[in-house]
Amino acid sequence: MRSTALAFWVVILLGGCTTTLPVASPDPLPAPLEARRYQVAIPTHDGLSLAATVYQPALASGDTAPVIIATHGFGGFRAKRPLSIYGQTMLTGEAAIAAWRQGYWVVFYDQRGFGGSQGDVQLMSPAHEVKDVSSVIDWALRHLPALHTLPDGRAAIGMIGESYGGGAQILASIHDPRLAALVPIATWYDLADGFAPNGHVRSQWGAHLFTLGSLSSGFDFGMALQRPFRSAFTGTLSREAQTLLREHSPSSFCARGEYPQADALLIQGFRDSLFGIEHAQANQSCFEAGGQEARLLAIQGGHILPWPIQPWSGKPLFNTDAVLGCGADAVPLPELVVQWWDEKLRGAPRQVPSFCAALDYEQSLHLAALPSNGETFAVRDASLHIPFAGMFEWLMVPVDVGGDIVRGFWQGKDLRQLRPNGGGGRPKFVPVYVVERDDEILLGTPELDMRLSGTASRASTRVFVGVGVQRAGARRVQVVNEQLTPLPHKGLHRQTLPPVATPLQAGDRVGLVVYGFSWQYAFNPSFWWSRARLQGELTLPLQEGLKSLPLELATP
């Protein structure tokens, strides 16, 4: 009985142990390898260890394979097995597992401070998390046999990760030339600007990320409570905190002429309410400035807040499109990622386009680049009450739906044309354009040149602006891609807004939408009752017919 019990506990204990591997031989494989996975502990540069799962591909004698390094987003964890949350529901895991099944090595590791890895979370510090990527590369080159090499003699190494894991690979590539083919998903160019545009914190995201980070790191996420970052709890980010976040961003390195040294397939979402398409565009420019190739798949999904803040589209907090129609047929996103690696790491023919944009979850366009043209309209008077305009907008959904049903019984029901509405308890909407044809789209980067005035003090006059669409026959005004930008004070505001993409139909009204309160920025509004007014110009990226664009519409 004792021997049976002892054997049971030995099996249990060994089941949680990591595999100890010998140093890999540079000679060809003497025998075939079977597909399997095992757990390892990877030593870091500063004496800690990172928990990782190695996926070993099936290889015949004499075969070689590239290696993919995969890692997770903030508060996440690695895919320990194919049948797991990350392996089945996250693009990082889906693509990594698909690559493994097609003959790639995969090393999927927990970032320091998360999951089974040691250390404290340092918010992608170049001296910590970024160096950890090099430690993983060192380990892979030392322990994985039969690694494929590129024509220049380097090992064929790719990487993938979303959000926090996307930042890891871009920053690591700036410092380590051994990475060859990256797939950064929904990540940042300027972390301060993403987390706090115009200095105002996306407080909903702050709350969710703080909770996830605390839980996944065993409540060891102390950086958020340090002095520079405590300002975030007030709704604004101090200059010191902004400086620290920028030091952990590609923007600071690119500004100094330090660029990534790998090619990249950037995947970013129009509806991403944390890091919009503009971050991918800036990262793309940084890669290209350093002489590297960077392609962009502009999907719809990414960081998506739970309903009712953003419409439901899948998993809460983070989800990506299942497929993207960049050509005649729709292709699953994991397959596009593997095609990218096949081209860059195995020398396969090119299949992934330079740019593809999803107009919604059903239609996409294969273009040369995101259109840069726009049409400018005057906005003469956008007046609203702060903070009430938009505060209870989600409660009005059934009222709007019921009103649309009743309105549908009358001919000529939709004769409002360019008449503004809202501004009291509802968001202010100032339509400036009525869509004429069913083949028009809104695709590109809006711009505003406006003066914000009001009855309160300079700092207490704060609004949130975006591009609105009021569909023909409907009362409700939709914020295109749910992209709202804070205008933090009185004065002149000249800036671009996040890029948007949406199909339009005849009779739709497009214009400026202004909120006095937004649940995306729940801590930020001025809670002192006042009136605000916007006047100036709005430039909309209206495309006046799909036939005028470089390539045709592709429908999955």
Predicted regions and their residues:
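Short beta-strand/loop motif that positions the catalytic acidic residue
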Residues: 260, 266-268
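N-terminal cap/lid segment of alpha/beta-hydrolase-fold proteins
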Residues: 25-63
